[in-house]
């Protein structure tokens, strides 16, 4: 349902920089190296309604935000929300939009399987009346910037530990976090590749 979708979207925001770091592959702009692993996001983030979304405490709050933008002629429909992740405007799903285009079919399958596993794990936690820690958009953007600049070769902030951690280590921790839902999803092989 849409209420579950907004809850999963809120929680999944934390993992966006992790998966983004795995997908970075746009280091050039106008034929020149930029020093970023993904410069595409630096360009795209200049547009409105992009980047990591705010936290919404309910689907009603999310819908009211969309209605206000439509009513005030900012957008003509919810498809004009270009966040890195959003509740799809026509389906009861969470849509992830942060990644650079993967270079291979296998990379595409792996990233899709990771997003699926994150959603399944967050759904499982919610079904057990548990929640994943919520962090502010400002903090999440720190990790997004690091992921865009350094990809998996840098470090990001582990907000729970309040320290910098190698991005690869955080990705391994993400894999451990979703491990128990992989058998049911049948996606272990896709992720292990």
Model segments located where?
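Helical (often loop-to-helix) elements that flank the catalytic cores of nucleotide-handling enzymes
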Residues: 1-20, 103-119
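C-terminal accessory/tail domains of diverse enzymes
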Residues: 41-193
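Metal-dependent DNA replication initiation modules
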Residues: 6-60
